[in-house]
Every structure is written in C-alpha cells, then in structure tokens.
Amino acid sequence: MKRVRIGVVGCGAIAQVHHLPNLAALDEQFDVAVVCDVSPRAAADAARRFHVPRHVTDWRDLLDTDLDAVLLCHTDPKTEAAIAVLQAGKHLFIEKPLCFSLDEIDALIAAQAAAGTVAQAGYMKVYDPAFELAQRAVRDIDRVRFVQVNHLHPDNALHLRQFDIRRFDDVSVQVVERTRAERSAAVRRAIGDVSPMVQRTFNLLSGSAIHDLYG
C-alpha cells in the first residue's frame, strides 16, 4: 500500500503530544516528509525527534512539493493556509478551530469543492483511548436512563506537565506581532468590538472547549 506523504505545519504542543507521535506509530500508512514552524529550532527539533527528513519555517514552502496531504495545527488563523493547501490540490487535515466566521467556512467549503480533495476537521478526541473506553462501557449498559457530562477546564499546565514538550524562544518579534494582529483581526471580523469578557468567552469556546460545541 502506498503511504500518504504528509507535511505538518505547527510543531507546538498538540503536534508533539498527539499528531507527530501518532503518525510515527502509523508509519506503514503515513510518511511525514516535512515539518514546518515559525520557530526554526522547533521545526528542527521536531524533525530530529520524529525522523522527518526536512523542516521549513514557512508553510508556503509546502505547496509546491509532492505531498499528498497537509496537517495544519499552527496558531490561528489558519484560513489562508487551508485555502492555499486545497488550491494546491492537496488533502487537508485542520486542527480546531477551523476558522472564526461563516464567511471563512464558506470560503473553505468552496475551495474544497473546487479542489475535489478531502478536508477534515481535527477531532482527534474521537479516537482518544479514554473516550473509546467510555464508549465501550456505555455499550455494556443494558438501558441508559440518564447521562451527565461535566467539562472541567483547569490550567493546561497540569495536563501538559506529563509530556516532554519542547518550547523555543527564537521566533522574531515581528512574526509574533503579525500573528497576534492577524488573530485579533479575524476575531474582530467574527464578533466585532466586544468587551474583554466576551472576547475571553469566545476564545475559550473556539479553543479548548470546542470539543463540546456543535452547530
């Protein structure tokens, strides 16, 4: 069986904890050909740890390669990169949140339809061993009469402490400021000029808590 050649954009916590280890474990099916991060050291370290032959710092460098698919798990917004990946004729796996507005999702849908490739949202929790265990436990119950689910959101540091997550400080100030400005502009287009509390709620619901929000 031909392995799927993949490029991974974003070498932060979610890539180090979930995506790159899982792709490495499934190496009979997937070939991670290149990783990308705005931090040169993060990209180089991920390439070394997960035996990836190439690393770059600009996602645009992936578009003219012979990749079959691109996994986007970098800092939001991801819409520009996602549309470019689809327009390059590649399959797309995009981490949550896909985008912040209906206009953006309409543009993504149109790009996917025009490309004829697969675009998938990254609900990796569906395949989390803990979730699969809970699913099996529920199946064994003869008759379910009541279900209550509480979503607790403590400081991520408590959860991430158990993993070997590498963080680097070599991203230029210009790149950091540009990324923050792009994200702020995308959020503003989605919800307008709102109070800090509303913006914080929006960030929570479109970030970690998105596992529990459906539309």
Residue ranges and their predicted role:
Residues 12-14, 75-77, 98-99, 125-127:
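Short beta->alpha connector loops
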Residues 30-34, 68-70, 119, 208:
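Short active-site oxyanion
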